[in-house]
């Protein structure tokens, strides 16, 4: 009987098979469309959905548009009666919030999880598949901190920073000495930033092997620069960036696993570096490897941007460069035993506490740079099954739902930062500080329940790099041939497709003294 059925089906030859193939394709296509078009039910008090969306995909503008005149976020806000709105990313329901009260709630509510928010940020897709336990609160810890946070804080202790300070200073000096006399800081400062991060937060073993360091660097750069907007909407969708990120992560895991396993096999205690410290704690090997992969991705993510922009700023705003130079000379004079030695040599005698507290002009420029360059949408996930009321409205963030806030709203507010597109570090001086007129008016270094856990090292790193750069060279803005560009200004391009892309600005370096 089965044979007869098959015979009848195959009568007509290729034509019948063509019809079967077409029918099968249409069935799969219709099933896929039915799945994509399925709209999950949402809480009745969710903010109204924005009309700015595409079939099946949802609001792709969330990931592709920043803050230009009529961008997606502004249009969605404008058509909302409350300033809050809902939108889809594929089949994920997301709530967007605006305003001071909602901003405070976004940063302080205990049910809103920072790490899970990474799942709808393009750069973080597939980095933790799923989110690893090292980023989850540890019930055995008194502080309830995650494994990742506990270990990161320990590696930034005064003892650790003092131990590594001489080498970190040497890394900065070597990195600055290797710069071309016409350079693009957005690219050229990467190697110094990454070398210091690896040394302090992972192991000297990698830094000592230039090929191994370069291999780690390439894989981390792949994770930093390769992502897909569409994978935010369709996490399961294969794409070139999906595979590149997976391969890079796999390579990093294997590289780090080799280092850890060699220590374990040798039996003898290794050098007192972060790898050995975590092994001495008898931490799980998987936790150790995952920690180092993650920290080497996270640490340089913003430092490379801020470091490159700070050097551009030194070349454009030469009045601020002179203020920074004066601070450097004052700090060196206060601690160097040889006042006649070259300034760059004197820097080696500055102790840790002075490196952290003796550069007020760098700190002002750093705050202004962070304000301008950390302007993008941020995300959290309501981990609870219960809705969270949105202050100032009758709306809620449903349970198990993502919520976003765009920091450009506050960072480029005319009332909090008069003439916000202007680079003006003096706005952070006593007597100004207009941003204090609202809760969380300055979002640099994180706020609320999620302050930046790497802030101590991040600030110290910028102080060291900028101090060596300015001590060694006079910086000025130029084009790629070295021709001066005196009309150059520092601008955060709000119309760019990506919020973290640095402008192609060049700088001319003139050595200040012979060493």
UniProtKB/Swiss-Prot annotation:
Domain of life of the native organism: Eukaryota
Phenotype of the disrupted gene, per the record: Impairs the production of neosartorin and accumulates blennolide C and 5-acetylblennolide A.
Key words of the record: Glycoprotein, Heme, Iron, Membrane, Metal-binding, Monooxygenase, Oxidoreductase, Transmembrane, Transmembrane helix
InterPro entries for this protein: Cyt_P450 (IPR001128), Cyt_P450_E_grp-IV (IPR002403), Cyt_P450_sf (IPR036396)
Residue ranges of the TM segments: 20-40
Keyword check for Transmembrane helix: yes
Metabolic or biological pathway: Secondary metabolite biosynthesis
Cell compartments where the protein resides: Membrane
Gene Ontology biological-process entries: biosynthetic process; sterol metabolic process
Cofactor: heme
One of the record's GO molecular function terms: iron ion binding
Record has Heme as a keyword: yes
Residues at which heme binds: 452
UniProt function note: Cytochrome P450 monooxygenase; part of the gene cluster that mediates the biosynthesis of the tetrahydroxanthone dimer neosartorin, which exhibits antibacterial activity. The two different monomeric units appear to be synthesized by the same set of enzymes, among which the Baeyer-Villiger monooxygenase nsrF is the key enzyme for the divergence of the biosynthetic routes. The pathway begins with the synthesis of atrochrysone thioester by the polyketide synthase nsrB.
Designated name of the protein: Cytochrome P450 monooxygenase nsrP
Name of encoding gene: nsrP
């Amino acid at each position: 009987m089965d044979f007869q059925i098959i015979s009848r089906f195959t009568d007509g030859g290729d034509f019948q098979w063509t019809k079967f193939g077409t029918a099968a394709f249409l069935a799969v296509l219709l099933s896929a469309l039915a799945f994509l078009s399925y709209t999950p039910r949402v809480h009745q008090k969710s903010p109204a959905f924005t009309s700015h969306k595409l079939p099946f995909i949802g609001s792709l503008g969330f990931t592709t548009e920043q803050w230009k005149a009529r961008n997606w976020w502004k249009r969605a806000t404008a058509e909302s009666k409350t300033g809050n709105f809902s939108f889809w990313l594929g089949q994920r329901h997301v709530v967007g919030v605006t305003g001071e009260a909602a901003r405070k709630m976004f940063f302080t509510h205990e049910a809103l999880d920072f790490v899970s928010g990474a799942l709808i940020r393009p750069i973080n897709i597939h980095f933790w598949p799923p989110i690893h336990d090292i980023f989850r609160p540890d019930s055995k810890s008194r502080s309830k901190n995650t494994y990742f946070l506990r270990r990161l804080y320990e590696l930034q202790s005064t003892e650790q920073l003092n131990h590594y300070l001489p080498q970190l200073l040497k890394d900065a000096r070597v990195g600055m000495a290797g710069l071309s006399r016409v350079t693009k800081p957005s690219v050229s400062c990467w190697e110094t930033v990454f070398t210091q991060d690896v040394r302090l937060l992972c192991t000297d073993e990698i830094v000592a092997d230039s090929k191994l360091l370069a291999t780690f660097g390439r894989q981390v750069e792949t994770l930093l620069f390769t992502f897909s907007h569409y994978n935010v909407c369709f996490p399961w969708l294969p794409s070139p960036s999906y595979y590149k990120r997976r391969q890079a992560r796999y390579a990093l895991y294997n590289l780090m696993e080799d280092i850890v396993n060699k220590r374990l096999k040798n039996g003898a205690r290794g050098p007192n570096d972060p790898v050995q410290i975590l092994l001495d704690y008898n931490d799980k090997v998987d936790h150790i490897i995952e920690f180092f992969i993650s920290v080497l991705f996270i640490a340089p993510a913003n430092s490379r941007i801020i470091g490159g922009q700070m050097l551009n700023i030194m070349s454009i705003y030469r009045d601020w460069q002179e203020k920074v130079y004066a601070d450097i000379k004052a700090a060196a004079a206060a601690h160097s035993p040889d006042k006649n030695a070259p300034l760059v040599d004197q820097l080696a005698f500055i102790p840790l506490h002075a490196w952290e507290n003796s550069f007020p002009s760098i700190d002002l420029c750093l705050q202004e740079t962070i304000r301008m360059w950390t302007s993008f949408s941020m995300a959290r996930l309501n981990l609870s099954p219960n809705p969270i009321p949105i202050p100032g409205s009758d709306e809620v963030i449903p349970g198990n739902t993502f919520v976003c806030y765009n920091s450009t709203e506050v960072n480029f507010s005319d009332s909090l930062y008069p003439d916000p597109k202007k680079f003006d570090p003096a706005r952070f001086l006593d007597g100004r500080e207009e941003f204090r007129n609202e809760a969380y008016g300055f979002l640099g270094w994180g706020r609320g329940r999620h302050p930046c856990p790497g802030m101590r090292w991040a600030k110290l790193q910028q102080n060291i790099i900028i101090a060596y750069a300015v001590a060694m060279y006079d910086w000025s803005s130029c084009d790629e041939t070295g021709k001066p560009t005196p009309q150059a200004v520092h601008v955060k391009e709000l119309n760019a497709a990506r919020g973290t892309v640095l402008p192609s600005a060049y700088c001319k370096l003139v050595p200040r003294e012979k060493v």
